[in-house]
Amino acid sequence: MHETNRSVVMLIPQEPFWAWLNSLPDSDLDDLSLEDLQDDPNAYLIDACDDIDQAWDEIISRLDELFSAELADWCEDPEHWPDINPEIFTEWFEVRIATVVADLPNKEMQRTPFEPIILNPDA
């Protein structure tokens, strides 16, 4: 086991995010619920932080990137996105932070480029 030089931020979707998701054109979410999204939220590695305040500083400095990643995961068209600002971000997501991240496997971590989910491939 190794301690990493990263902290982690988990963004737990809330009701306003779910309402937006359901309002998207051609979205088919019959097999998905808000609880499903909350049970398996996206997690983002950020620079290592000594405390929660430092982690929040990192989150705020990367707010556009984090919020855009969450939105693009479901809708690639920014025309359907809300304004990206801290107020909407904190309404749409509960933020959970872990300042210490340990890497248990004894092998190199792999990285792959982000690819958004295609909700309706036939649309």
Model-derived regions, located:
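Short intrinsically disordered terminal tails
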Residues: 1, 122-123
